[in-house]
Design a protein with these regions (language model features):
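Catalytic-core signature of thiol
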Residues: 2-339
Length: 339
């Protein structure tokens, strides 16, 4: 039985051993004899979490993902950023200008009355979903996704840029141990980025790798600046974050990279996630992703987010989360590059 289709009723119809065997085959999991029993126990504990959350009949469906054999602590250590996101400088706020209008003039009229839904994947501004592997390099994927979209809207061809260059060569950030998109933007402004084809990703097993200087001599992408889209710092004392302003910025300037508390994403399968217990402060954000769109489904507003855990996770690599409540800090740290 396909794991993607395993809901609570389906799980009750098959033995735990069969479910475990299907999981291992689906995700090509192998363990030592000593490790097998402990991984099975963790898997069973996650099944209980999945069943409990799905019984609540929310707007999301939790299920067996490739991370179902990990504890929450292991998941964070292997796939999220372990370095606190300590900001060292304030960023200038977005000035509200429609910088993307050079490619889509009609976007200027949308700011007065934004549509109920918009998706940049349908307008050519988003490259295919990528895979960071067991490396806390999400910040580099958030950065490249943001720059890819901004340059596309500035009338360049959509080009997949090199995360590996940032992971290995950006000395301000910490490679597989985490980083900040704004520091990465600073690197891109000074050094530029080559394409993914020129400098392919190799850090999937957790090694940042040394900078291959010979591969970064012909950059194809630069940015001129970067801005803060939503409130941060003293703004956190406000009752609400400016998610409506984020909509305007998204439409006007393309996909936006954000920080998020990714703890609820470990067992996410599909639907609009509405986590009850996740962090919203800057210090609690442990993952970087790319907002590519928004919409409303059955009365529930959501953000559509491009993740970097390959297409075998979530909705073909994408994640949807409730919009308007700053869930998991989606509006706590939204930053954006400027072409």
């Amino acid at each position: 039985m396909a794991l993607a289709m395993m809901t609570v009723p389906a799980l009750s119809m098959v033995s735990h051993a069969e479910t475990w065997a299907t999981f291992k085959a689906t995700y090509r999991k192998t363990y030592t004899v000593e490790e097998e029993a402990s991984r099975f126990d963790i898997f069973m504990a996650n099944l209980r979490i999945i069943e409990a959350e799905n019984r609540a009949q929310g707007t999301e469906v939790k299920g067996i993902t490739k991370f179902a054999d990990l504890t929450a602590e292991e998941f964070k250590a292997r796939y999220l950023m372990n370095t606190p996101r300590n900001k060292t400088e304030a960023l200038k706020p977005w000035d509200g200008k429609c910088t993307a209008c050079v490619r889509f003039p009609e976007q200027a009229t949308l700011l007065a009355a934004p549509p109920t839904a918009y998706d940049w994947t349908e307008h050519g501004a988003v490259t295919p979903v990528k895979d960071q592997g067991q490396c806390g390099s999400c910040w580099s994927f958030g950065t490249t996704g943001d720059v890819e979209g901004v340059l596309f809207l500035a009338k360049h061809n959509l080009t997949s840029l090199s995360e590996q260059q940032l992971v290995s060569c950006d000395e301000k950030d910490l490679g597989c141990d985490g980083g900040l998109q704004e520091d990465a933007f600073k690197y891109v402004k000074k050094n530029g980025l080559v394409t993914e084809q020129q400098y392919p990703y190799t850090s999937g097993k957790g090694k940042s790798g040394r900078c291959e200087e010979a591969l970064i001599q012909n950059p194809v992408a630069f940015v001129s600046d970067w801005v803060q889209i939503s409130c941060l710092g003293s703004c956190e004392k406000k009752a609400a974050f400016d998610e409506e302003g984020m909509i305007n910025a998204l439409i006007a300037t393309g996909p936006i990279t954000i920080g998020i508390d990714a703890s609820p994403m470990q067992l996410y399968k599909r639907g609009i996630d509405n986590p009850k217990n996740c962090k919203t402060s800057q210090a609690g954000l442990d993952h970087a992703v790319l907002i590519v769109g928004y919409g409303v489904e059955n009365g529930t507003p959501y953000w559509k987010i491009k993740n970097s855990w390959n297409t075998d996770w979530g909705e073909d690599g994408y994640y949807r989360i409730v919009r308007g409540l700053n869930k998991c800090g989606v509006a706590s740290d939204a930053v954006h590059s400027v072409a």
